[in-house]
Amino acid sequence: MNMDFNLFMNDIVRQARQEITAAGYTELKTAEEVDEALTKKGTTLVMVNSVCGCAGGIARPAAYHSVHYDKRPDQLVTVFAGQDKEATARARDYFEGYPPSSPSFAILKDGKIMKMVERHEIEGHEPMAVVAKLQEAFEEYCEEV
């Protein structure tokens, strides 16, 4: 049974990774990759991915749909909570003033946290409500593409 569960979870993780990278997000798997990405000039949207139901049913669809907008971040990146622990911990160091939360979204500008959309703003909400929250932040912090 343990072997079956591990295979099942590996499949879930693989699918979760594929969904977010297919949406145009770059996976960051090490602390060094996080530092390189999050210290770049411009705006960055970080999606903290997760295997929970609200990640698959709400956060990842919102991550995909939110960026189809006139104003959007310069780069889209993702870390995977519970999987890429070093990268996730390092990304959370940039989210000053916010407790760890997954799934979640962070908008950074020139390496500084501007806005978080935390799990409590995702779980129990419709994907389009999360899209609206993200696009509201894009209006405030991002340039027109």
Curated annotation (Swiss-Prot):
Disulfide bonds join 52-54. It comes from Bacillus subtilis (strain 168). Disruption phenotype: Sensitive to cumene hydroperoxide (CHP) as indicated by growth inhibition assay. No effect on growth after NaOCl treatment. The keyword Oxidoreductase applies. It holds the Pfam family Disulph_isomer. This is Bacilliredoxin BrxB. It comes from the Bacteria. The gene is brxB. The modification S-bacillithiol cysteine disulfide is found at residue 52. S-bacillithiolation is the formation of mixed disulfide bonds between protein thiols and the general thiol reductant bacillithiol (BSH) under oxidative stress. BSH is an equivalent of glutathione (GSH) in Firmicutes. This protein is a dithiol bacilliredoxin, which debacillithiolates (removes BSH) the S-bacillithiolated OhrR (OhrR-SSB) in vitro and in vivo NaOCl-generated S-bacillithiolated MetE (MetE-SSB). Involved in maintaining redox homeostasis in response to disulfide stress conditions. N-terminal Cys of the CXC active site motif can react with bacillithiol (BSH) to form mixed disulfides. S-bacillithiolation protects Cys residues against overoxidation by acting as a redox switch in response to oxidative stress. The active site is at residues 52, 54. Induction: Expression is up-regulated by cumene hydroperoxide (CHP). A motif (CXC active site motif) lies at residues 52-54. Interacts with BrxC.
